[in-house]
Amino acid sequence: LADAATSYTDVMSEYDGGSRTFFHFRGANARLSAEHILQMESPARIFHLGYLLLLDELDKPDPQHGVVAARVLKELQAKGYETSVDVVSEEGGRFRSIVEPCLPHIDYFIVNEIEAGAVCGTQLRSPEGVLLRDRVEAAAEMLMHRGIGRLCAIHFPEGGYALTREGDTCWCDAIPVAAKAIVSSVGAGDAFCAGMLYAQHERMPLRDALRLANASARFNLF
């Protein structure tokens, strides 16, 4: 789009606590439409869409499918693509209203524990911040019941958990990293997602897929 600037994000990280603030400029991404995507022809096996809730045209309501993104994903699956979706963490009711209609048309749903909890309407950590493994498992099952086609993977600083359509499950602990060695955690979730998608593309066993995803996230920290 010649008349639109490229989208970008500035991330401000605290030196001590590691808290992050994101300043995002949508730019041309706000005008990415169903037509732009559906005219695409590619020999690739997996179509990855990111990020829902930041793509104005695709986040719009659709009378038949809930949101435009759901229609796009359904049509891509009909063309033979396996679909993957990433979302941006956002508070409020808009999150579920946009993400839920897409679930039946997503093959691989790879999200963090905050995003998984937001879709399911529950907290996956205790008030003290402890990861609740039973809730993680229940959230993955709930997401699969809502239509995810092949795999739901939930990642968190402690590691990752995955559930397949066939009912296979796996927990995998994160690879230990000394806090002082971490340069930034920005992009670690994306690195996990990339590792998991590569593993799915190569049809790797579930445990190996989680190990690769965790390793990819680990090396993103330096």
What does each of the following model-derived ranges do?
Residues 146-151, 175-222:
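Conserved post-catalytic alpha-helical subdomain immediately downstream of the catalytic base
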